[in-house]
Amino acid sequence: MKIEIMLKKLKVITNVFCVIALLTGKSFGQINQSKINKSDFTDPYAVFSNPPEAAKPGVLWMWMGTNLSKEGITKDLEALKNAGFKRTTMFSLSDITTPWAADIKNSPTPNIISWTEPWWKLVRHAAEEAKRLNMDFGMFNGPSYESSGGTWITPELSMQEICWSQNLVSGNKHISLQLKRPQVNPRANQSFPHYNPNTGLFEKPEIEARKTYYKDIVVLAMPAKGIVPENKVINLSKKMTPDGLLEWDAPEGEWTIYRFGHTTMGALIQPAQWEATGFECDKMSATAVEFHLNHVITETQKYLGDLIGTGFSHIHFDSYEAGVPTWTPKMREEFKNRRGYDATPHLATFAGRIINSKADSTKFKNDFDATIKDLYRDVYFKTIAKKLKEANLDFLCEPYGGPWRQDEIMPLVKNVMTEFWTTNGTYAPYELDPTVAALRKSGQNIIEAEAFTGFPDDSKWSETPAWVKPIGDAAFCAGVNRMILHRFVQQPWNDKILPGATMGQWGTHFDRTQTWWKNGMPALVKYWQRCQALLQWGNIVPTFADDFASENIEGKPLIKSIHRKSQDVDIYFVANTCHNKAIVKCIFQVAGMQPELWDPVNGNARSVNSFKEKDGKTIFDLEFDDAQSYFVVFRNKYVKPINPIAQNFSTKKEVLKINSTWKVSFDSAWGGPVKPVIFNVLEDWTKNNNLGIKYYSGTATYHTSFDFKTNKKSDDTSSLYIELGEVKEIAAIKLNGKDLGVLWTAPWSVEIPAGLLKEKKNQLTIEVSNLWANRLIGDEQELDDCEWLKGQMGDFSPGHKAGSYLKQFPDWFVKKQPRPSKGRYCFTTWKYFTKESPLISSGLIGPVKITQR
């Protein structure tokens, strides 16, 4: 969750795309409906049709402050299991993450403080449930998600910074001078402001230890002006008493006396509950790192010991935002051992002085930085890897953003994770490409990503599976093959409290309280499982200019691809990563093989029968709907068919438009009409005059009846499809009592099994789920029965609309009384909308048709 640099680079990273060479050509084909004999499929199809455990995605599970419950934990894990997830990594955060460490007053469960016994009991319950459900459960290495520390870290074990005071004196006499102790800004030297409950301000809080904790390093005297030869730097440390009194016979000339020391940076872990907030440990001190890890492991073993390796499996370290320290107690000896010379005379470069020459001072700074990188590797990361291995815990990490060499760290980590965001609805990688490149080089096959981290502009209970699909597809094409979703929030309350808890303003709302979770999430996860199964199979083929090329024939797609290979099998994932239809000529660096087209949305597979070969390449057209993707698989030698079929994609023929009336049932618990409503014509709910429909959020059930008379001949091998037209946002279809599945992305159609249609009274039922946004906006038309405070994003993200957070849990909520505002239905901890916010199109808009292909 790299907030700081990510925010600085938004305009750059939104323009980072996979490079695909473009070649010219013209072609257009039609669908061939001949089926592949699935018994002929070898290993790739086995994992595609039945994805293994390794292909299942995971989530970052956010426990927000005191808002936790056993019942909610069980429901969360069961929902994840049923949807097809495998791993969950828990973070224990503040009630609200922006402002950092903000709390919501009047909590129903105020005693649940991170890393205290009531909290650990809930962690144990989660581990027991994970074991029961055969899920992989672990957690971050302390409170917060940044970076490694807690209340147990004292000032001397915290991250350190060098500081100094200076005095100008004239020589040729005895100097008796009280040297001032170096002073630093008492406010924390950290990346982001905190909400400080002691002052009520959003600030970098004053740290008492930055006023009181100090250790001397050295006292140096040198000529007051100009470049200073190293032999003119005089160490006066032995001439200063412990209380800072200097007694020195100064040579002739003007001298500057520097008193160098170090103090705590005051860097605090973020964003944790205020009661659980403490210092970041010194990452360059073996004493501090071991102390932190011993505390983490000892507490984990105390409460979860018998579950380690079964219900509890890993400790996570997130992307680094703790700042760069400039000192550690053993820095001088570490520097000399690693760089071969004494750093002491050169410390004045921190005060802006030049020692020997500009080149020498530059070299010293580079050597000093290199020593910091060495210590992060040898002290911090190697100690983590060693300690966790000894404790039988896996080491998970996002190894970027900090003062180290990334390629040296990744081999120490069991599961390396990279990161991508959603920015203005597009794929926005952060440190993804270099991480993937380094992982490929090291031979690691599984490339995980913190996936879909989002700003409130995009992520405000308005996300859909169809919206996230092309963003995830772009990440797949960049090399990611295991999604770890950001984020899934622990929902502690009963199922009437919806949409419930949030991570403040951050992240895509992959929560079990989503309107579309029941029908949409299993379908989306199955898609990811199929993709990840094939994207983990074999090895990535290094990218080169003509490995895959495409030329747009119709439309304006953004085509991305990735190529994997194992022995004689080539697998290409080809994705249209924008919401445009297109026909694209595709050129693959394969010859003599039969191309096959596998659809990860529905699991269907078929041969490509119309293609040509030229110069060792296979060439054919692909027809893409909005954000559609395919796997193109070459695994069998090409054998020329006896009766060749010249077309790959066929035009569809409309055989019936369903114009009958629809009976639509809404859930009155969320403001919908109590009785079913007749729709003579399908329409957007937001255009309806009935406010219960206009502002409705949730699932509504459409039902209609229609007659159908087929003109198909007995030898006609074409198939019939139900086409839904425009759907906002998820549709689960039943025809004559048979479940035809869930539609969540284009093309919005499903094949009708042979023999299912009748001539008379076909019964069609469609469950349609929209988004929470409209009900939340509808609630804003009513009197508010909660108090809100403005969300703070700070100066580091200008232009983003944050929203407001709940000031306190209202008494009616805590006491489980009827809410005062009868026209309100939703309850959540973050407000994204006002009464003027635009509604989002909803419902089955159609037209609904039967087509033949």
Where are the regions that the model predicts?
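Short beta-strand segments within Ig-like beta-sandwich modules, predominantly Fibronectin type-III
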Residues: 610-612, 740-744
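Acidic/aromatic-lined carbohydrate-recognition and catalytic surfaces
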Residues: 93-239, 248, 269-270, 276-277, ...
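Aromatic-lined ligand-binding clefts that engage carbohydrates, nucleic acids, or primary amines
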Residues: 587, 706-708, 712-736, 743, ...
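Mature N-terminal segment immediately following signal peptide/propeptide cleavage
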Residues: 40-87
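Bacterial Sec-dependent N-terminal signal peptides
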Residues: 1-34
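Extended acidic/polar, glycine-enriched regions
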Residues: 210-211, 215-303, 612-654, 759-761
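An acidic-aromatic loop/edge-strand motif
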Residues: 145-148, 152, 168-170, 183-216, ...
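Carbohydrate-binding surfaces of carbohydrate-active enzymes
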Residues: 57, 73-74, 87-88, 108-145, ...
